[in-house]
Amino acid sequence: MNPAYSNQATVDISLDLKCVQKIMVPGTSVKSSKEALRLSRIYPDVIYSTAGIHPHDSKSIIEDPSSWFEFQEIASSQECVAIGPCGLDYQRDFSEPDVQKEIFEKQLLLATSLGKAILIHERSAQQDVLDILDKFQNLPPVIIRSFMGTAEEAIKYLDRRFYISLTGYLCKDKSDTGVRRLLDNGTLPLDRLLVETDSPFMYPNTRASKLPQHVKTGITERSLLYLHRYCTFQRNEPCSLPAIVEMIAAFMKKSPDEVALATSFNALKLFGLS
C-alpha cells in the first residue's frame, strides 16, 4: 500500500461520491500488506486487501527470512482476497532477477494452497514470468495488473486464460501495437478485462493530445468533475475509475454501462466479493 493512502481521507472521498462501491488496497511488502489488512478491517465489506511482495521488495524476504511467516499469516486472513502484486520487474534493479524469481514462486505456491487469485506485476520480463507460471498445473485465477505491454504480449496472456487489468495508462500509450489496439480491434474480450486506478499512479490525463477525440467526448462531465477536482498528476485517486471505464468503452465502441457491468462482475467473481 502506498504511504499516501495510510489515512482515511482518500477512502471517504470515493465512497461519499458513490463513484466506487468497493476498494482493493494492495500490499507490496510485509509491512504494507499488514497495513492494507488493517484498513480492510476498519471498512469491512467495502475495503479488501491483498498480500504481496512486489518484485522490487523481494530481497527483503531474503534479508529477513522470518518475515515470510508473518506474510503467510496476513495472506491467510479472510479479508485478504488475493496474493500480489508479485512477479518480475527487469526495468529496475532493486532486487536481483534470481531473487525476484525465488520470491515470485513462493507466492505462487502460497496462492495455490490458499486458492486465492494472483495479481501479477510484469515489466520487461514476460517470457520469464510465463516460464514460471507454466510450471504450475492448477493455478488460481491470474490477473496481469496495470498492463502496459503490446497487443502481442497480451495475446500470450489471454491464450492462457489470464485476465488483463487496465489503468489510466491508456492516455499515455501512443503506440500502434499497445493497449489501445487491444481495445480497438477486439483482441481483449470483456470477460477477460478488469479495470483499476493503480492509485496514486497512472493518472488518466484526459487532455492528452494523442487521445482520440471520440474518446475524449465519451467521458461524461460528472467523471471529469471527479477527476479534476480530486486527482492530480502526482496523486491519482479511486474516484478516477469512472473516467477510465468511459475511455475503455469508447475505444471498444461499447457503452460505459456494459463495460462497468462486465468488469464489476469479473472482479466480484475473481475475488469472491459480495
PLM feature segments, named:
Residues 1-274:
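Mid-domain alpha/beta scaffold segments of enzyme catalytic cores
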